Amino acid sequence: MNIFIDKNAKTTPTNFSWQFGVGNDHAFQMHRADMCEHIKLAHDELGFKYLRFHGIFDDDMLCVQRLSDYKPFRAVPHSKEIEEVNFLQVAKVYDNVLACGMKPFVELSFMPSALASGKKTGIRYLNNITQPKSLARWSDFIEKFINFLLRRYGKEEVESWYFEVWNEPDLAIFFKGKQQDYFRLYEATAR
């Protein structure tokens, strides 16, 4: 292959739109020091501004924990109904993103098992891709999440972030449902 560059041709300035952001697969990876080093390098050397990843609500992020998730307590009456909502692991991830000089591009996914209508998982890391069993409960969960972000990072900071409802709901490996199901999920999330 030969490449010819006409150095006398008219040029146009680059708009650097590619520097807007980069994807990083799974949120939990941002707990790793080596991943943070790579993301900081991407920011410092390439100018990326936002970082987007999947799975901030995956079970390994411990956002919703039920007493029944712990084997010794499964026999306790109503153990599935006793739960805690906690965004500490998500906060650690976002703290790391901000420490790298970037801002989060928040993908509101996937479904915590405690809120899920089923057990269908997507690719690799057991992300639950089902819809919530209760849209009202999901909406309440999202409201708690947004309030947590506002308390921790402040309104001005959070307003500088981008938010996305789910990841590629048109692909069966990421969302179990039809287009109308996604529209209902979106409406319940964006309230």
Question: Which residues fall in each region the model found?
Answer:
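Aromatic- and kink-enriched transmembrane "portal" helix at the membrane-lumen/periplasm boundary
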Residues: 169-173
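Short, solvent-exposed loop/turn segments at secondary-structure boundaries
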Residues: 174-179
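Non-catalytic accessory regions flanking glycosidase/transglycosidase catalytic cores in CAZymes
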Residues: 1-162, 180-191
